[in-house]
A protein has these predicted regions:
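Bacterial N-terminal signal peptides
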Residues: 9-19
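Middle-to-C-terminal accessory/interaction subdomains
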Residues: 181, 334-338, 344-415, 421-562
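Predominantly extracytoplasmic/ectodomain segments of secreted and cell-surface proteins
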Residues: 24-105, 113-118
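Short, well-structured beta-strand/strand-turn elements
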Residues: 73-75, 237-249, 410, 588, ...
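Feature responds to low-complexity, polar/acidic, surface-exposed segments characteristic
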Residues: 169-175, 555-574, 582-583, 587-636, ...
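Internal "kinase-insert"/substrate-recognition segments embedded within catalytic cores
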Residues: 196-199, 210, 217, 238-243, ...
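N-terminal module-boundary/linker segments of secreted carbohydrate-active enzymes
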Residues: 98-104, 115-167
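Conserved oxyanion/phosphate-binding beta-strand-loop segments in alpha/beta enzyme cores
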Residues: 157-217, 358
Length: 743
């Protein structure tokens, strides 16, 4: 994908959206406006070998302007032709008396003896944002996207879906944002800072005006509505400060960049998390500090012996009781922040605001959260203070936040992007705002079972559900509020169904469908039906999920609901995974994640066999240079090498992390069976397996034995796939059969 800069016919083709066409009032018939400092240029872009123009919903196709070098040109389509002159408006619709073909205006631009096929697409229903870099050559989009910390400035214009001007002025900063969305995907999310506070979402509330906003790429979300839907559902459920958002078409230095979600940033500020700004108090208490980023950090431990990091050299304001905004995050990410602390259960929380905490403030907030965690782990009562967990955390917000995380099946629940805030002068924390749902609702890469408890099976969730008062609160809110919102609004087939901010899935999809179609062409996301499929899949998921949760008694959940989230009970290998787990042969990647599709490694297989043998005592250090002591696999690898189940390499390595094939797994199991004295005679591999000759010579006996004993079967009725990866679910089935047959 690149901006087209061909010199064919000396063409420089751009669509000029004239300022009059974008004014709040519709232009008078026949009126055109000369470009001025509100004109926005959109470049022709090459995508997949085709040239495309992506226009915003406010584009007037009866008064488009092409700018190009050279003599007047012509546009042709369907045997029709219209003349165009650079800088002069023309009526594109004259080429299409019957309308465009499937929403795409395909024409040929002819100039002199050259011609260029062009496809033009137009958005609908949503606004558009135009970002123009102050220095596009040195600090344009490519510079901003090189490193997340790179910052640039420029101007920004935001046009509403109705053509009204919402903002046109200074963009004091644009930079990258996000974690996996920044590193893993080509479509980058941004944070922008305006020159003045503005209510970009036009809520009508002056308190919603702000300088800082985020642009979420939602690259992983095929429907593009998951974040908006969830934010609005949380708002309807009564969670304060749930982010407001709106989809827009983004143009950056003349290039269309796709559908983005213009969203409020999760921060302490008016119109956001509207509590006292303790960060401002720290700034007032330290007037000599010019740049807080320059202050050094130090680490310490609180009264519970848990590590934290704080900023040194800060004077405390008079009151450090709030407000705080905390986020549970992965330890690796937390360590990159200025102020964070760990809990007694090994989890990390970052102070998002204040970003720079003194040691006293860190002691205070980390201690408050730790007392809450201790209370939850002790059945709801802190064993030292005697206080209830609800003395430390607001029950209503915690129960409502939990339900949003659970209904959406958010894989980050209580691991990352889970926020708490604490107002000044209050004794307790509050849960929220909710955040980051672009891979929720069945879209998580772990492929959770639809009927699995997710938020309630992670970190603090499971302990909370063991407390009767929490389960009862969740049950009441679901039965009396959330179920009604889901049934009456979210799943309503009417696109007009709405309650406050919350709309139906059909309504959200209708709003964004034309823009998302352009986005999918730009980013090569699926085919023409991808949005329809995503919409139907989402509705079906929410319907199934709601039905399942409605049947649960949250105050008395059975143990089965806490099974591996990614191993559905209706899948064929469920019984095998359950068998090897209960036998102690396998364990999950985490307490509730099995990752059945992950490939087994040499260390994993050695460990399973070691457990099969009863985990015998191992004397002496590992014989391999790459197997240090005190690793989870150290004893298993040393044992496996000692009895001849697994060999090392000539250079002294074992390579514990190397992924193995099906024939390698079977060979290790075959050697173990021989070690135990089992009968190793076997028939040849049956001829029905057409790929039996692809079994390596060194693995033929092992495969023949495993097939003969019924320990392994084919990946299809006619294929053994000996050189295919040995996945965890396959290995679970193999070891179950072995244990039942020979164990």
């Amino acid at each position: 994908m690149k901006v087209w800069k061909s010199t064919i016919c000396a063409l420089l083709l751009v669509i000029l959206l004239t300022p009059c066409a974008m004014a709040a009032a519709a232009p008078a018939p026949g009126l055109t406006c000369a470009p001025d400092n509100r004109g926005n240029l959109i470049s022709l872009q090459e995508v997949g070998g085709e040239y495309l123009l992506f226009l915003p919903s406010t584009a007037d196709l009866t008064a488009l302007t092409l700018n190009f070098e050279g003599e007047p040109a012509a546009l042709t389509a369907g045997g029709r032709e219209i003349a165009v002159t650079s800088g002069q408006p023309f009526d594109l619709t004259a080429l299409y008396p019957g309308g465009p073909d499937d929403g795409v205006y395909a024409f040929t631009f002819r100039a002199g003896s050259g011609q260029t096929p062009v496809k033009l697409m137009v958005s609908e229903n949503i606004g558009s944002m135009f970002i123009t870099s102050a220095d596009p050559v040195n600090k344009g989009r490519s510079y901003v996207e090189q490193v997340k910390g790179n910052k640039a400035s420029g101007r920004m214009t935001l046009i509403g879906a109705d053509g009204g001007l919402i903002y046109s002025g200074e963009l004091s900063q644009i930079k990258g944002r996000g974690n996996s969305t920044w590193t893993a995907y080509p479509k980058k999310p941004y944070q922008i800072k305006l020159g003045k506070k503005t209510d970009l979402l036009q809520t009508g509330d002056p308190g919603e005006a702000a300088k800082t906003w985020v642009l979420l790429a939602n690259y992983y979300d095929k429907s593009f509505i998951l974040n908006t839907l969830t934010f609005d559902l949380a708002d309807a459920l009564g969670l304060p400060y749930s982010p407001n958002s709106r989809p827009i078409d983004l143009y950056y230095d003349g290039e269309y960049r796709g559908t983005y979600l213009l969203c409020e940033k999760t921060e302490i500020n008016g119109g956001r998390v509207d509590i006292h700004d303790l960060e401002g108090d720290f700034e007032d208490a330290n007037p000599e500090v010019e740049d807080f980023d320059d202050l050094p950090t130090a680490r310490g431990t609180n009264a519970w012996g848990n590590e934290y990091q704080y900023v040194t050299g800060l004077s405390d304001p008079d009151d450090i009781s709030g407000g705080y905004l905390l986020e549970i995050d992965y330890s690796g990410r937390a360590a990159a922040e200025k102020s964070w602390f760990t809990t007694s259960r090994g989890y990390s929380l970052v102070s998002k605001s204040p970003e720079y905490l003194s040691e006293n403030a860190m002691e205070y907030i980390s201690g408050l959260y730790q007392e809450f965690e201790d209370a939850v782990w002790n059945g709801g009562v802190n064993p030292t203070t005697g206080k209830s967990y609800t003395d430390y955390m607001d029950l209503e917000s915690l129960a409502r936040c939990y339900l949003i995380l659970e209904l959406s099946q958010d894989g980050d629940a209580f691991f990352s992007s889970t926020f708490f805030y604490k107002p000044q002068g209050e004794d307790k924390l509050y849960a929220g705002p909710v955040w980051d749902f672009d891979s929720a609702y069945g879209g998580n890469y772990l492929h959770f079972n639809d009927t699995a408890i997710v938020a309630g099976a992670t970190y603090i969730g499971r302990k909370l559900l063991a407390i009767p008062s929490f389960g009862e609160a969740v049950e009441q809110i679901y039965e009396n509020e959330l179920n009604r919102l889901v049934t009456d609004i979210v799943l309503n087939a009417d696109p007009e169904a709405q309650s406050g901010r919350l709309r139906s899935v059909a309504g959200y999809i209708a709003e964004v469908s034309a823009s998302q179609r352009m986005n999918n062409v730009l980013w090569s996301v699926g085919g023409p039906g991808v949005l329809t499929d995503a919409s139907e899949s989402l509705r079906n998921f929410i319907s199934r999920r709601n039905e399942y949760l409605c049947e649960l008694d949250f105050s008395q959940l059975p143990d089965d609901v806490f099974w591996y989230l990614d191993v559905p009970q209706n899948i064929w290998y469920y019984s095998a995974v359950r068998y090897v787990t209960e036998k102690g042969l396998f364990s999950g990647i985490t307490d509730n994640i099995f990752m059945p599709d992950e490939v087994m490694t040499r260390a994993m297989v050695a460990t399973v066999l070691y457990r099969q043998a009863g985990s015998p005592k191992v004397e002496g250090p590992s014989p391999f240079s790459d197997v240090p002591e005190n690793q989870w696999y150290s004893d298993a690898v040393a044992w496996a090498a000692d009895i001849g189940v697994a060999d090392g390499y000539s250079d002294g390595r074992f390579d514990p992390g190397r992924e193995i094939t099906r024939q390698e797994l079977v060979t290790m199991l075959y050697r173990y069976a021989a070690y135990t004295g089992a009968d190793m005679t076997a028939q040849e591999i049956p001829e029905k397996y057409l790929d039996r000759d692809s079994v390596s010579d060194w693995a033929v006996d092992a495969f023949a034995w495993a097939v003969d004993r019924g320990i392994i079967d084919g990946t299809s009725p006619s294929e053994l796939s000996p050189r295919g990866n040995a996945l965890r679910y396959m290995a679970a089935a193999i070891f179950q059969r072995y244990d039942e047959t020979l164990g």
